Amino acid sequence: MDELCLKEIFEDFNEKFSGKKCRVETNYSKLNNFIVSFDVLDLHHLLGLHKVIPLKATDSIESIKQERLTLESFKNHSQYSDIKPRIENYEFIEEVFKASSIEVCILEKDIKQKSSMNLAVVFFKKDRNKYIVLGLKRNIRTNTFHLATLHETRSKQYESYKKTKFEITEWI
């Protein structure tokens, strides 16, 4: 996606991920596999739309679908610079779950600095002088994992954490 377009991102996510689940296997015996569930509503937070528009996820996704919400809608917002990297790094989701170009993750047991996000799994990659981070939360009720955050950081904290090998073994 050379030019950023919310509708293209929505359509891509809808086609490749939304409504689907995948099984992830790890080399950690206490969590040797888990299910990741994908929902198009996750895009609202992944792309940081909650920072620049007062809409709920269902309304923002519907507005994107109808092309009433575009990047132009909030390009002048004071927090646009916070969400632009999220949109630019959207394809990292595919790198993790489809292209299998990321081979290690960090599990909750190894996350030393707990944040308010309460992430259960973190995928990351170094990109020049920054890290692209995709975090998952665990839904205790369904015992599945969901995409929760996609952002950039300059912090090198993830480099020092113990890493766990993983593999996407099947799409359900």
Explain the meaning of each model-derived region.
Residues 91-172:
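Conserved binding-pocket/active-site segment within a compact domain
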Residues 1-124:
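An acidic, glycine-rich, mixed-charge low-complexity segment common to nucleic-acid enzymes
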